[in-house]
């Protein structure tokens, strides 16, 4: 238990530079098409520059859904099209996710689906978001947890993709971080309220 606590604490205190540098600009958001059932409508593309048994992706997704830590993550090796079984979410919250996965097969791009769902289909479908499946090999998981935050190979964020434009979160459903909200409040502490106008081409859904 003590080792697990120290590993989690290390992960919390060692954020990559991208954590502070990421700005949610349009260039990071795109559209594509895939079969959504079991994968969901949203994914991040990350790139690993060298094969590694433990790769770590920092994904600043800025999600508005509640309890993202209760929803699963699916990682797909783009070059093979196969799912990666060895996946371990390190830290999941609405602002970002830190995910470790096995990239020993090859370097290159990986899809990270972060809102996978199952639907019953039909005119009144029931949709559920399954929790993280425990498919990781126990030995890999132990190695993964023993790897210090600074020693895992960092996967670089390429961009986010949605299933077509209708499902895109950008820009109106990309949340502000707690730090950004507090900075806005502090900069306008002498004002009774703030009015933030937006172009009508960006409706609130």
PLM region spans:
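Alpha-mannosidase-like glycoside hydrolase catalytic domains involved in N-glycan trimming
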Residues: 20-205
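Positively charged n-region of N-terminal signal peptides that target proteins for export
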Residues: 1-4
